[in-house]
Amino acid sequence: MSKKIKKENLFISTQQDAQQAQILMPGQEQLQFRVEDTFKCPIYLADKPEWVDTLNKASDPIIERVRKNWKKKIKDPKDSTKQMPNSLHSELLWQYPEFKEIANLILQQSWNILHWQGYNLTGKLPMLTELWVQEFPEEGGFHDIHEHGNNHISGFYFLKCNEKTSHPVFHDPRPGKKMTDLQMRDPSKLNYGSGQVHYKVKPGQFIFFN
């Protein structure tokens, strides 16, 4: 005759309010943890509104040329293009003198950030791999989650935006966390368990990240 084995729940799911102490195993003391924030993922924000007008003046003709080129492709019966793209994207801008100042600032700030993060930059100089202006349609536009390969620093400088403008969304880069993630109690609040964060943007705002 087999003996019936009593099964116990090793993981107790509570329905307590978020403000109450969460007790998984009755009678166990609550440890007073010392929390150390290691492997941080900083995002750097700064404002330089005095460049907006000058850079808009330099960028507008470039975007308009890109727009006209796309319209020509759509009208060309020999071209397979049928509609405008999700965004208007310029060529590399460091070749133009109007963008030399912002290019130099990006290089210097990128070096500073990597230095602050503890990297050994002795004998190393930063190099731009990409620099472009991009315009999304008023109806809205978006990019899926992606990365820019072989770049130690990426960033934005916002020229035209308002309270309705789409905002950049940053995702937790740790693949292990993504594979085992749990549902958040309140996704609107930024917490240790949050998987993404976004920032409202304004003209003249820099955002650097890596």
Q: What role is predicted for each listed range?
A:
Residues 3-120, 142:
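Non-heme Fe(II)/2-oxoglutarate
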Residues 133-207:
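Catalytic core of non-heme Fe(II) oxygenases with the double-stranded beta-helix
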Residues 120-131:
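A short coil-to-beta-strand element that immediately follows conserved catalytic motifs
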Residues 40-43, 128, 165, 204:
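Sequence-level motif detector for i,i+2 pairs with an aromatic at +2
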Residues 38, 125, 148-151:
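A short catalytic or substrate-binding loop motif that flags glycine-/basic-rich loops and adjacent residues
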